[in-house]
Regions:
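The feature captures the LRR N-terminal capping module
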Residues: 1-152, 157-161, 171, 184, ...
Length: 274
């Protein structure tokens, strides 16, 4: 019923949308998903908070700047999309949703993240791109199961050394920031598979050949004087990428990566939890 709900709501004028949902949506959708993206909502209809078995809630592309405390009732929620809204601060009620695996916060007005974010210890994917972050909040380094971090299009100049704690992190997207050097902490993260530092101000790249898990490095649109050296089988996207990679120092299967894996804006259909 989640998809049918979206289709029905599309025929309701935006100023009547919230009233319609409150009065007519009486049962939780069978697929345990509610998608209210692009509905010009200024507040979350409280009735949604009564669907305690809800797993996926998409609120992207609205006019939200706060969330009701009743959202805490959704303790089975695994995916929450709040991107493309007007949040200047992350509502603390989000940090009570301890089953969250995927959290989309991109394209808001966030300058920081609350310490309470550390409570989301099941979080595996965090998108905080296109906000107003001048530094990566250290609380992110406490999300020990995090596998994917998208922090592109902010104003980051460096990364905290504590990031090395994230031993499950496989993909980090840092394009469109203010990095003047390749973040040293990434050299101590051997399990990283994808590193994107496109569109920064990095002039000199260190060798990445010692990172055994690396599959793809994107470094285009930097004023660099060299290409990062990588092990054989690692894909590079950027200037001088045709140079011969260094031989891999350990045996292992070569996994091909295509240019299609370069980060892009969040898709209309968000990925499922792993």
């Amino acid at each position: 019923m989640g998809n049918s709900l979206k289709a029905v709501v599309a025929f309701v004028p935006s100023n009547e949308c919230q009233k319609y949902l409150l009065e007519d949506l009486e049962e939780m959708p069978v697929d345990k998903m509610v998608d209210l993206s692009g509905r010009q909502l200024r507040r979350l209809p409280l009735h949604i908070c009564s669907f305690r078995e809800l797993v996926k809630l998409y609120l992207s592309d609205n006019n939200l700047n706060h969330l009701p405390p009743e959202l805490e009732q959704l303790q089975n929620l695994q995916i929450l999309a709040l991107d493309f809204n007007n949040f200047k601060a992350l509502p603390l009620v989000v940090c009570t949703l301890k089953q969250l695996c995927i959290l989309y916060l991109g394209n808001n007005k966030l300058c920081s993240l609350p310490l309470e974010l550390r409570l989301l210890q099941n979080l595996k994917t965090l998108w905080i791109e296109s906000n107003c972050l001048q530094r990566l909040p250290e609380v992110v380094c406490e999300l020990t199961l995090l596998k994917t971090l998208h922090a592109g299009s902010n104003a980051l100049r460096a990364l905290p050394a504590q990031l090395r704690r994230l031993q499950e992190l496989r993909t980090i997207w840092l394009s469109g920031n203010l990095l003047s050097e390749f973040p040293p902490v990434l050299l101590d993260m051997p399990f990283l598979e994808v590193i994107d530092v496109d569109r920064n101000s990095i002039r000199l790249f260190p060798s990445l050949a010692h990172l055994p898990g690396l599959k793809l490095v994107i470094y285009d649109h930097n004023p660099c004087r060299n290409a990062p050296k990588v092990a054989k089988g690692v894909r590079r996207v950027g200037r001088w990428s045709e140079e011969t990679p260094e031989p891999r120092k350990r045996s292992g299967a070569v996994i091909e990566i295509t240019l299609d894996e370069k980060p892009s804006p969040p898709p209309a259909a968000k990925p499922e939890p792993e």
